[in-house]
């Protein structure tokens, strides 16, 4: 779903814990003086975990002959009998046997764009868990389609451009009708990477009312925005969603995070069964370059929006062997090595996530889905040495069926300058934005990680996977890791604290979020909890540092890969725009679905250590922490 560093603030972030503050890079919109953070969607979601769901559905009648979509639909109808809604066309059954069905609430035939209901159905066809953010207030009695008393979509486009100071010229814009109710594409504009679009939708506001809005979509490179412009007053912008997730950090053989951990080595045929066409074919065409079914990698020194004709190393024999030296300068002198490294890391992470269940039906990034579900034609476009920025990286995640786009930058924090493609953790973090945005809320919805807390978790998941993958056989629970240290030329990395199980080294607790106002700060808290969880599972199940997990009945047999699998499964279970408590419950539910809750108490203890235990409560202004465990633990 939606992407995550919307706009880094130019001011230093507030950090009540006495520690050097993180420095956040500003993106295009913040440089234009627009604070996108102030336009984030409000958190509206509720989540009913498997225990609560079992109690609720006892009084409901379901037929054994119902398929999982029908069962889910009946639940939504019984929960909101007076509401209208539609089934989103992105339902699928995960590798853990859980069926995921997503619904969008409607009013007068128009979507309420931030009103979602997700239902998870177990292997026996029963409701496993569900979450929703459906609107419960009064629906406007007057159908806006009757009198058509709303603004012209062109005015909405111009309103979005003006309010956000977008680099889009819309003076000659004309709206062309497209498929869908009140859906338009704009002709005659310049400045956007693709033609802007507009859809008439309702939007839940913070005050509990509905606003009729034009959802204006503009892809301007570093920001791919959905701007909700009031349909009666085009100068009013209610909220903004950004598909682009930016990071603040930055590979060699899989498991080596950066050049300080080893040297480049030659690896033959590294793909797994997750890539049946290999990394250099999409099942129809074989490519003698860094292009295939999962990704297409190239340099992009100008920072432009086109990529097909950009430079890629060519090798008819598929031997991509290029020199690199830590003293080489500028980074463009080793662009062949850089592009190859980026292509390798991206594909390697694709294959790992596929083994965990991020496959075609779940909305992964592939051109050819091989009739396995989902929407194809959406490999990851990955740009090395992208000239549109420095000291950062980002990933844009549109809905399933449209390619993801990663931009990796050079870092000017060292002499010679460093190439972010050579720090695997940054590439993994960025690609993880694509993972979480496609899973949370369903592959067709890319706006479910746009609230402050859910957006923070989006950053945290990226850090977690980057850190989990770099673990070494010598590591113990006392091992600490930084994020982005090599690229930033700072051993402490780019986060406020090291990732550590030691509460003195990293004192972050659940209630720390009360004083944090930036997604990367909040993400560090969430990733810290997941780091504790991973080590708790390693202590319970042992660790393996092989590149590929070993499964038994679908369950990874070591704690490190089990943690990665459970965290990923939780993403698909939780509601749209979840909070920490709901995401914790979704991980517990993921363990119930996968192992019959074999790790229940281990998971509870890990979260309780950081104040997200039994009884912890979410409140946007005053979260309540708890170190307690539930009965039975």
From Swiss-Prot:
Keywords: Glycoprotein, Hydrolase, Metal-binding, Metalloprotease, Protease, Secreted, Signal, Virulence, Zinc, Zymogen. GO terms for biological process: proteolysis. The keyword Protein biosynthesis does not apply. Glycans are attached at residues 410, 480, 622. SUPFAM superfamilies: Metalloproteases ('zincins'), catalytic domain. It comes from the Eukaryota. This is Extracellular metalloproteinase 3. It comes from Trichophyton tonsurans.
């Amino acid at each position: 779903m939606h992407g995550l560093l919307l706009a880094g603030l130019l001011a230093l972030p507030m950090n009540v814990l006495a520690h050097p503050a993180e420095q956040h890079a500003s993106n295009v919109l913040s440089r234009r003086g627009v604070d996108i953070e102030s336009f984030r969607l409000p958190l509206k979601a509720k989540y009913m975990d498997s225990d609560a769901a079992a109690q609720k559905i006892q009084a409901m009648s379901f037929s054994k002959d119902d398929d999982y979509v029908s069962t889910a639909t009946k639940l939504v109808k019984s929960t909101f009998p007076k509401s209208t809604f539609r089934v989103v066309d992105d339902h699928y059954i995960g590798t853990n046997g859980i069926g995921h069905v997503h619904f969008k609430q409607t009013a007068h035939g128009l979507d309420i764009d931030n009103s979602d209901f997700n239902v998870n159905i177990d292997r026996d066809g029963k409701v496993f868990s569900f979450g929703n953010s459906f609107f419960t207030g009064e629906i406007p009695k007057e159908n806006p389609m009757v009198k058509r008393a709303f603004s012209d979509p062109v005015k909405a486009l111009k309103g979005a451009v003006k309010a956000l100071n977008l680099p889009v010229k819309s003076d000659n814009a004309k709206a062309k009708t497209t498929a869908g109710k009140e859906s338009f594409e704009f002709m005659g504009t310049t400045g956007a990477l693709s033609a802007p679009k507009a859809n008439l939708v309702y939007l839940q506001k913070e005050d509990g009312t509905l606003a009729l809005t034009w959802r204006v979509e503009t892809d301007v490179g570093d920001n791919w925005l959905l701007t909700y412009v009031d349909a009666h007053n085009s100068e009013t912008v209610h909220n903004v969603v950004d598909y682009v997730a930016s990071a603040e950090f930055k590979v060699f053989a899989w498991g080596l995070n950066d050049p300080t951990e080893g040297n480049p080595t030659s690896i033959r045929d590294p793909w797994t069964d997750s890539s049946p066409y290999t990394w250099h074919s999409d099942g129809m065409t074989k490519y003698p370059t860094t292009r295939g079914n999962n990704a297409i990698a190239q340099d992009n020194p100008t920072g432009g929006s086109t990529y097909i004709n950009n430079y890629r190393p060519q090798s008819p024999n598929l031997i991509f062997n290029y020199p690199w030296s830590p003293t080489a300068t500028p980074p463009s002198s080793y662009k062949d090595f850089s592009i190859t490294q980026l292509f390798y890391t991206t594909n390697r992470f694709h294959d790992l996530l596929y083994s965990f269940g991020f496959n075609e039906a779940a909305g992964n990034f592939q051109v050819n889905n091989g009739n396995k579900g989902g929407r194809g034609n959406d490999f990851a476009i990955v740009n090395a040495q992208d000239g549109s920025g420095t000291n950062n990286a980002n990933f844009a995640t549109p809905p399933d069926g449209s390619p993801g786009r990663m931009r990796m930058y050079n870092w000017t924090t060292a002499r010679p300058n460093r190439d972010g493609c050579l720090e695997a953790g940054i590439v993994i973090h960025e690609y993880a934005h694509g993972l979480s945005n496609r899973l949370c809320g369903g592959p067709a919805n890319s706006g479910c990680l746009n609230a402050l807390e859910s957006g923070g978790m989006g950053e945290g998941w990226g850090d977690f996977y980057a850190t989990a993958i770099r673990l070494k056989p010598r590591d113990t629970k006392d091992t600490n890791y930084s994020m982005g240290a090599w690229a930033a030329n700072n051993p402490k990395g780019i986060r406020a604290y090291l990732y550590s199980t030691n509460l003195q080294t990293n004192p972050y607790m659940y209630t720390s979020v009360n004083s944090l106002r930036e997604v990367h700060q909040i993400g560090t808290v969430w990733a810290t909890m997941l780091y504790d969880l991973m080590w708790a599972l390693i202590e319970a199940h042992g660790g393996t540092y092989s590149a590929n997990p070993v499964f038994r009945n679908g369950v990874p047999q070591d704690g490190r890969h089990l943690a990665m699998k459970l965290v990923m499964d939780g993403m698909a279970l939780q509601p749209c725009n979840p909070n920490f408590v709901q995401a914790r419950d979704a991980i517990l539910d993921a363990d119930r679905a996968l192992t019959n809750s074999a790790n229940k108490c281990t998971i509870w203890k890990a979260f309780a250590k950081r104040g997200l235990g039994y009884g912890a409560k979410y409140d946007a202004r005053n979260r309540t922490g708890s170190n307690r465990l539930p009965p039975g633990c």
